Amino acid sequence: ERLRGKELADAYNRTGARDEEGRRALLEEMLAALGTRVWIEPPLHVAYGSRTHLGDDVYANFGLTLVDDVEVFVGNRVMFAPHVTVSTTGHPVHPDLRR
C-alpha cells in the first residue's frame, strides 16, 4: 500500500503542466477522498496517500508532503503554502525516550 502511494505520487509529479485530467485521475486513484476544484502543484509526496481525504476548493503550492500514517482530513477552502508537511506521526523528541 505504501509503495502504491509513492508510485502514484511519482506518476503525478511527472504529469505535464496542462494535463489537468491526468492529474485528477491520479489523485482520485491515490487518495481516500477528493473534493471538487482541488489543485496540487507538483511535487507531491505521500506516505500512503490512501489515508488522505481532501475537501472542496483545496489548493496546495509546490512541495506538499503528507505523512498519512493514519487518516488525514483536510476541509473545504484550504490553502497550503509551499513546502508544507502534514505529519500524523513522529519520533520521540525527549532524549530518554529515544534510547
Residue ranges with predicted function:
Residues 44-54, 59-99:
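Flexible, glycine/small-residue-enriched loop-and-beta-strand segment within the central core
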Residues 1-37, 93:
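Terminal amphipathic alpha-helical/low-complexity segments used for targeting or macromolecular assembly
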Residues 32-34, 38, 46, 72:
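Hydrophobic beta-strand core residues of beta-sandwich domains
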